[in-house]
Amino acid sequence: MSSVQSSQTQKNDDAEVFDALIVGAGFNGIYQLHRLRQEGFKVRLFEAGADMGGIWYWNCYPGARVDSHIPIYEFSIEELWRDWNWTERFPAWDELRRYFHYVDKKLDLSRDIRFGMRVSAAEFDEARDQWVIRTTDGTVVRARFFILCTGFASKPYIPNYKGLESFAGESFHTGLWPQEGASFTGKRVGVVGTGASGVQVVQEASKDAAHLTVFQRTPILALPMQQRKLDVETQQRMKADYPEIFRIRRETFGGFDILRDERSALEVPPEERCALYEKLWQKGGFHYWIGGFSDILTNEEANRTMYDFWRDKTRARIKNPALADKLAPMEPPHPFGVKRPSLEQWYYEAFNQDNVSLVDVREMPIVEIVPEGVLTSDGLVELDMLVLATGFDAVTGGLTQIDIHGTGGITLKEKWTEGARTYLGFATSGFPNMLFLYGPQSPSGFCNGPTCAEMQGEWVVDCLKHMRENNKGRIEATAQAEEEWAQLLNSIAGMTLFPRADSWYMGANIPGKPRQLLNFPGVPIYMDQCNTAAAKDYEGFVLD
C-alpha cells in the first residue's frame, strides 16, 4: 500500500463497518443481499441507479426486453414465483422493473440498499483485512468482503467518432436512455449498431420515424423471438413443472431449460436435420442457438448447416435481393452462434419499408458526425436523432472503471492491462476478500442471469460461511491457480469456434482491449470446478 493510500485509509477509522459491501442491485446483487442476510451477515448494497433492476434500470429504450424466456428469467425461490405472473413470454423492461419491485416487497431488500451511490474507489487495508470503499458523493464505508455484482454490461461503449459532440439533434446511447423517454415520431432517426439493442430500437423506430437509417458493420444473425402473451391460468398450470424446470436449468450449458441433441449434425440425414432446425425455429428464442446438435459450436462443417438454414429462412423475408445480401449474406460473416444472437420480431420486415434504409459502414465508413447528421464516405445522412446502439465494454469494464487498489497499491485496471486474470471467475490474486459474480472467466455472457446469480451466489455464501466458521478473515486466490485457470479456459476455447469472431465474448468490440475469451463455456463444467475447489478446503486460495 502506498503512503498516500495508507494515509487515506487511516483517516477513515470511524467509517461504518460491514461484513460485506455489495455493488449492484441486479439479479446477482439482490440475491447476494438476500442470502447473506439470511445467514446473519451484516450487509449493505450500493446501487448507482435510482432504483433496483440492474441493467433493467438503465436499459429503458423503446423495445427493450429480455432475450431469455419465462420462467427461466426469474428467481427459483418459490416464495417469489408462486404469486407472480408475467404478461409476456419475453418481458419488456417496464415489466421487469415491476418484478424487481415485487421481489423487493417480498424480501424487504430496500432497507439495506442505498440508491444513487456510485462506487468510485476501493482500497484494501492490509492491517485490518478490510476494504475501504468510497462513492462519488464522498461516502466511505469499510467491509470485510467486497462483492462486485456489476454485471457484464454496465459500462456503455461510445465510439470515438470525430465531431460526435457537435451533433445538433438528440443523441442517446441505448444503455443510457433518458428515464423520461424519447420519441421517434416524425423524426429522421439514425441507429449505429445492430446488436441486441440496435435490433430492438430499429423495430420500434421503423413504426414511427419519418425515416430510419441503420448503420451496419456486421450483419446480426438474429433469431425469431416468437413472442406471445401469457395469461394467469396458463402460468398457474405451468407452475407445477417449475421445480423441474429450475433443476434442469442448473444442468445445461447456458442455464436454460433447453436440452441439445447429443448427435453430430453431420451424422443425421439432411431431411431429419432440417426438421429439427424447423422445430427449434418455431419454438423461438434461443432454442435454435443452443438446442441443436452437439457439434454446432465446435465443428465448422456442422456449424455451416445451421447458418445455411438461418440464411434461407431469413432471406425469404427480405424483398430486395441487394438488401438480403447485406442482412443475410450467402457466405457467413462468422460461424453461426459464436456471437450472441439477438432475438427479433419484425426486424427483417422493417427493411421492406420505404422509410427504412441500410448503410453498410464497411463499404461506406462513417467519416465524422456533423451538426446535421452523419457524414459517410458516400455523403451526408441528415438526422434529427442519433441512437448509439454500440454496446458495452463487456464483462471487465464494469470492474475496471472503479479505481480498485489491492495489496501493494496495484490497481485492478493495471493488473488486467494485458487481459483479465482470475481464479474460478470469482477472484484475482493481489485483491484479497474481493469477489465478483457474473464477471470475467465465469459463464456470465453465456449464461442466463438468474441461473448464474443463484449458482455462483450460493458458492459465495458457502465460502463466507466457511470462513466465519473457521475463524478466517482473509481469502486470496494464488497466482498459480490463476495461471492454471487461464490454461483450462484457453484449452476449452481452442476446441470451439468462438475465437473465430470479433465479438464482445472475445473483447474484440473495444479498440485496444486484449483479445481473450472472457466467458467460461458451460455452466455444469464451471460449477464442477468451483465445487471441487471448495470441497478441497478452497484449493487455489490462501485462507488466513
UniProtKB/Swiss-Prot annotation:
Enzyme kind, highest EC tier: oxidoreductase
Note: Displays a different regioselectivity from O.batsensis BVMO.
Usage in biotechnology: This enzyme offers a promising route for the synthesis of chiral enol-lactones, when expressed in an engineered strain deprived of enone reductase activity.
Top-rank taxon: Bacteria
Organism of origin: Parvibaculum lavamentivorans (strain DS-1 / DSM 13023 / NCIMB 13966)
Protein name per its UniProtKB record: Baeyer-Villiger monooxygenase
Site (Transition state stabilizer): 340
Alphabetized UniProt keyword annotations: FAD, Flavoprotein, Monooxygenase, NADP, Oxidoreductase
EC code: 1.14.13.-
Function: Catalyzes a Baeyer-Villiger oxidation reaction, i.e. the insertion of an oxygen atom into a carbon-carbon bond adjacent to a carbonyl, which converts ketones to esters or lactones using NADPH as an electron donor. Besides cycloalkanones, can use cyclic alpha,beta-unsaturated ketones as substrates, leading to enol-lactones. Can also act on methylated cycloalkanones and methylated cycloalkenones with high enantioselectivity in some cases.
UniProt lineage: Bacteria, Pseudomonadati, Pseudomonadota, Alphaproteobacteria, Hyphomicrobiales
Cofactor requirement: FAD
Family membership noted in the UniProt record: Belongs to the FAD-binding monooxygenase family.
GO molecular function, one term: N,N-dimethylaniline monooxygenase activity
Residues where FAD binds: 27, 47, 56, 67, 73, 119
Xref: Pfam families: FMO-like
